[in-house]
Amino acid sequence: MLPAQINQTKPPMFHDGEEKLPPNNYEKANNSFVLSYARDEWLQRKLIERESEYLEFRNLKIFCGTFNANGKSPTSIDISKWLCGGEPDPSAMKDCYVCSFQEIVDLNAANVIAEGHSAKRTTQWANMILQTLNQLAPIKIHESGGRNDFGGSFDSTSNKDDWSNGNGSRESGGSGGSGGSGGSSGSGETNNNRNSNHSKSSENEEHPQHETGAYRLIASKYLVGIAIVAFIKAEHVNNVGDVQVQTAGVGIGGFVGNKGAAALRFTYGNSSICAVSSHLSAHRGAVGSRNSDYNNILNKVQFKDRHTDGNNSSSSISILDHDYVFWLGDLNYRIQVDISTEECYRRIRSNKKTEKGQNDLVWLRSQDQLNIERAHGRVFELFEEGVLNFLPTYKYIPGEDVYDDRPEKKMRAPAWCDRVLWYCRMGNNSVNTMNSGGSGTKLIKQIKYQRENSIKISDHKPVYGTFDVQVKMIVKQEQKRVYNELMRGEWVI
């Protein structure tokens, strides 16, 4: 049978150079079974070797936004400017939206222990985003199972059972990943049974899907105050598959979810994408704790590898095993501790008034802890970030547009706590040379990196990055041609 998606992991017959025997006793296996197994492995390797003959790159526009909500409800705010990214033209709307939140609820003991409030607040944010996207974007009518937006010449690699036919119908959350309570919708990390009938349970009704709208919910996941939600344009639904969610608590005791991450993954065509929403340790002097949080999240977040031998239950996919990763959130890195709060304010305020002020902002960036730690290879060493050409996003007086330097309050030095970073497994500067004669487009390119000033409910400002991502799509006719050529040819183990 012609495979719809090529698994690029190690062939299941081999593991670290040692032979892995097929099920049952190898010596007693039927010869025809052994030959068939070996031929399948050979065919898999050859298809991967010749993938340039049947894969094509297409551009996917992705929005990644992060916001520390300071425990506030989203019901009374307008998030359209944030999601538009300064481009109100409907034609500028992105194909995929990933939104990360921190402190969706107050981080008190009751909310850390019980997940009910977190679930409700995650639903509120997801519904508001979906409603806003569908109001902003032009509505297109799509037939069920219809053509994708690339003209229908590509193979849809998504399995409808992988994500509830793309409608994001809600599942019970339960404990998710490593530490802390968590909940999900769209796809659970343990339950592979999907609701293909779109049943009208009370949980499903929490996530109305606006079936005639331009966008669909892919998945959502929360961990105490942390949440992540993802949406896709309706015309892209058939290209999405293998949606999974996970969490990692790294807070109190190294596992409680007051700090940590909620993550999701999905495939688009023949490319894999992961997004991580994280909230790292606070306080200006806790650089080492933040670095440790990052590494703990990297180790704890593991997704199920659904393409490996079914007998290998321990097989998993890490964050960095994906083609593209977006890491966003309140990373809590501050300005270096030896820079006084007063000096930070002086530099920021001069930036507003004089040409020299721009130099002041550049100097302040040089004192940013995350920039320093990355430069020394101690954290996010494989990730890239755009230039911080915007003012620090923390700490503001909620409801106002000014930094909180009130003398009666504990003054915090302004900082770029809220960040969006990205990673490309092929290399962050890699280009698409497939079918391009040796030159091509960068596999991932950041288009914009900015903060949004219109949202004032929090002591943080939202941040967003927009990206052009080159995803691989299978051209069915060409794949079939290569497959038939291999089947007709001679093969060797």
Please report, for each region that a protein language model flagged, where it lies by residue.
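Non-catalytic interaction/assembly regions
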Residues: 2-95, 143, 149-166, 170-174, ...
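Short interface patches used for recognition in eukaryotic signaling and trafficking proteins
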Residues: 47-48, 64, 106-119, 212, ...
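Beta-strand-turn-beta hairpins that frame and shape the catalytic cleft
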Residues: 54-62, 224-228, 234-240, 259-275
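General structural concept
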Residues: 60-140
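Short catalytic/ligand-binding loop motif for oxyanion handling, primarily in non-cytosolic enzymes
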Residues: 73-74, 106-110, 225-227, 239, ...
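Catalytic lobes of large eukaryotic enzymes
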Residues: 120-145, 149, 157-158, 171-174, ...
